[in-house]
Structures are given as C-alpha cells and as structure tokens.
A protein has these predicted regions:
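Glycine-rich phosphate-binding loop of actin/hexokinase-like ATP-binding domains
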Residues: 74-130
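Conserved sequence/active-site signature of Rossmann-fold short-chain dehydrogenase/reductase
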Residues: 23-24, 89-90, 135
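Short secondary-structure boundary segments
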Residues: 20, 86-88, 194
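Flexible loop/hinge segments that line or gate small-molecule binding clefts
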Residues: 42, 94, 156-157
C-alpha cells in the first residue's frame, strides 16, 4: 500500500533500511507507548524480508542517522566527527577518517547510558536528563502535555520557558561528556541533532 501511495513500483524496491533505538525497551523511559515491550520479541528484519522479498538492513538509530549525515549532510565536510542524536532517548555515533566506527560490540557512542548529575545533584543516566522523554516529563510536571516533537513549537510562553530551562540543563549535563569525547577522539566537529 505504501509503495502505491507514493507512486513507486515494487520492481524499483531494492531493499529496506530500518533504524531502531538500541535496547528497546529495556531502557525504560517515561512516555513510552503501552505496547513498547513488543520490540523485545519482534525481529523486524525477517518479518519485512518475508513480506516484501527484498534485503532488509536494521541499524541502531544513531548509527543510521550518522550514515545519512555522512552521505548527505555535514559528514561530507567533516571526516572525523561525533554525532549526538536526541530522540525519546539519547544516542551517539562516531565517524573516524570517513568511516563509521562501530566498536568491538557495535555499541560505540552509547551516550545515554553514561552517568551524570541532575539539577539536584543525584547521579542518573544522562538520557534521563537529556532526551525528548525527559523534556516531555518536565513539561508534564507543569501540566503541559506533549507527545511529539512538532507539538513543541506551538507552545505558549510558559512552555517555551520550560524548554529553554531544559536546554540549559541539557547543555550542563552534556558538557563533561563532550569534553571527554573531544580529548579522547579529537573530532573536527560534534553534531547535535534531534
């Protein structure tokens, strides 16, 4: 149905790329959909391959975004960069000398699991501070319900002030991590996208 809707013949479909966050849903975050746990037992690649009869490539969402950046974005300008992806969780990915670096277990750049201190001084995983889930929780605590990024731009002045305060906290939280990445990897750039 989707191919028909966008006007692409099935004969032109040569493969499918799927981007999924790592550790879904083991890394419990607020505002997850009720059936999020199904991703622990669903292997999407064979399901799509059997249905569409094309190769299926499944990749971590931050790594997939980084590969896209390498092909179509600032990765064409920078050969060594670190990519920070802020979505429902927090991810990262590393490119060294024009090559995506996966690490020994394919998990390089896993920022969200690092520890950091929140505004009260308590140690937490930094994705519980720097992620859209964390932002939505901060807004919800003030009575503002948001469930998608496009809803953020239409918020009133109080909502925008909460977002601005969250950005300040996010910057403070990421600072030590970004300094460590700069010292250890020395990238030409750190790209932060959502």
């Amino acid at each position: 149905k989707l191919l028909t809707k966008v006007g692409i013949g099935r004969d032109r479909l040569v493969g499918i790329g799927v981007a999924l966050p790592d550790d879904m849903p083991r890394a419990a975050l607020p505002h997850q959909p009720a059936n999020y746990g199904i991703w622990q037992t669903t292997d999407l690649a064979p399901l799509l391959r059997e249905t569409l009869h094309v190769p299926v490539f499944v990749e971590n969402d931050a790594a997939a975004a980084t590969m896209g950046e390498m092909q179509f974005g600032l990765g064409k300008k920078y050969q060594t960069f670190f990519y920070v992806l802020i979505t429902a969780a927090l991810g990262g990915s590393l490119v060294i000398d024009g090559n995506h670096f996966r690490g020994a277990g394919g998990r390089s750049g896993e920022l969200g699991m690092l520890r950091g201190r929140d505004a009260t001084g308590h140690e937490r995983q930094i994705q519980n501070i720097v992620s859209l889930s964390a932002l939505y929780s901060r807004l919800a605590a003030q009575g503002i319900r948001v469930s998608a990024p496009n809803e953020l731009t239409g918020l009133h002045e109080r909502g925008q002030a909460i977002i601005a305060a969250w950005v300040e906290v996010a910057v403070d939280t990421l600072l030590d991590t970004m300094l460590a990445i700069n010292c250890l990897v020395n990238p030409e750039a750190v790209l932060i996208l959502s």
